[in-house]
Amino acid sequence: MGSLRFTQENQNILFIGTSGVGKTHLATAIGIEGCKQGISTQFIRCSDLINKLQTAQVQGRSEEVLRRYARFQILIIDEIGYLPIESVGAKLFFQLIERRYERKSTIITTNIPPSKWGNTFSDKMLANAILDRLVHHAKVIRITGRSYRMKDHLIEKKDNSGPDLSGFSSQNKERSSETL
């Protein structure tokens, strides 16, 4: 990961996996390394990005904001799919991805498999166009396993009170990821 060669080739990275498996942690680590190497880097949650793009459009500043996010060599967009993206937001998001396509590197974290992105974006054709541009020059990394956040919780409760955490263990042997 130290070389960040993917940025020289304007490749993208998609981290796909359930909540708590380390997608954001890995994306953040890449972003920090990018900053250390002097690479322009921005991290933003998808919902915040969509809100900023929509607000800018209402204020007549969408071009300015799209240009701003298009210029970063590494743009990390966290948590695509946690909240639905309505038509206006989806169109603005597409414009941003189109501007970055084959010019800059975008890192995406999502808990939604690409086949379900049509449910996240209000327009399935637009979702396909976005996904097509993101995965064309991308390393797609699927991370499996159990949530790091739940690993320290007890798996057995003698009094049967509280949530059932029997599906979680303190050791996670199912993790897998690809070396960048």
Segments from the language model and where they lie:
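Walker B motif beta-strand of ABC-family P-loop ATPases
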Residues: 74
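Conserved P-loop
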Residues: 1-71, 120
